């Protein structure tokens, strides 16, 4: 999996059904990881039954390893186990064809899909203001017409809200974060640093002091993509699980309450039922999740998590209120946000200019944090609030696509 600088267009098709369990195959453009799979349980499977299933799995794998000793390199078996909100239970790992066949025969299994590479998606009253904004997107989201250079916002600025950035990490020491950014979880390597830059740029738009929409928000880095901006779908889902648990108080409880948390996923890959179910579990937990629509100039229904209806899917606009030529579109898009030539932070200090729906999504995540700070209800319903506030501004938005551009309600 990677950021939405470029997401891989794909549709998962049912390959076969064995005793009720669907085995899915990736489309022709997916970068599948050899012998790696995600196994998703049926929604009515209890934690006790899930535990019994994984115990059976471990025992079966150990038995086969003993029989095969010395004959070939053994498969790694189960590597990750997921439980999101009691409604999404799954595991991932490395399995051979024979083991996949056995797993698929279990009644508790809903479907099995191949693991694949995911990439980042780059290509009022009492208001205060920021003049001569460093990035045009800030001014655009606080005024009804394009061309402004001032960002108008309430001084509450997202204080008391926590934003989880599921990406390449964050340079938490960057001066523009003012000590409000910290590391949450690293699922990639032993380096708590953003060696790519994508995550820091995204976080800067969400909540940088100078470059961000929610200038008082707390930021948490969840690293699921490597220095090249890539990672596995299974690893991304593990990061989603950690962030949801932390936001709900099940981890360190950074956000204290799910309704005071927002999340951003400026990444995507082929359409994945597993990813979409995990995203829905986050929404069902009462957490607002903004995601990038993707950069293939195609219908976003073919990408995940953009195709999940319960999240807030964001397409990219240009400085003159046009659709960015790379941006995905379609009925799953909820809103447009600035995404072309966006200036934000880079690791080590200073700034960088990037384009992509990766840059659009954090505008919506930051706006979500800002609105919660103003007292708006959090959770997935916040996307409806954002759509209601948005301006009908985008010219030629794409087939069957909204023309709504986000607006913070400043009255300007």
UniProtKB/Swiss-Prot annotation:
GO cellular component, one term: extracellular region
InterPro entries: PCSK9_ProteinaseK-like, Peptidase_S8/S53_dom, Peptidase_S8/S53_dom_sf, Peptidase_S8_Asp-AS, Peptidase_S8_His-AS, Peptidase_S8_Ser-AS, Peptidase_S8_subtilisin-like, Peptidase_S8_subtilisin-rel
Keywords: Glycoprotein, Hydrolase, Protease, Secreted, Serine protease, Signal, Virulence, Zymogen
Glycosylation sites: 123, 126, 252, 264, 325, 408
Active site: 167, 198, 358
EC number: 3.4.21.-
Domain Peptidase S8 as annotated: residue spans: 135-412
SUPFAM superfamilies to which the protein is assigned, alphabetical: Protease propeptides/inhibitors (SSF54897), Subtilisin-like (SSF52743)
UniProt cross-references to Pfam families, sorted A to Z: Inhibitor_I9 (PF05922), Peptidase_S8 (PF00082)
Chain positions listed as propeptide in the UniProt record: 21-127
Signal peptide: 1-20
Compartment list: Secreted
Membrane-spanning ranges: none
A single BP term in Gene Ontology: proteolysis
GO molecular function: serine-type endopeptidase activity
Main function: Secreted subtilisin-like serine protease with keratinolytic activity that contributes to pathogenicity.
Family to which the UniProt record says this protein belongs: Belongs to the peptidase S8 family.
Name listed for the protein in its UniProt record: Subtilisin-like protease 6
Organism (species): Trichophyton verrucosum (Cattle ringworm fungus)
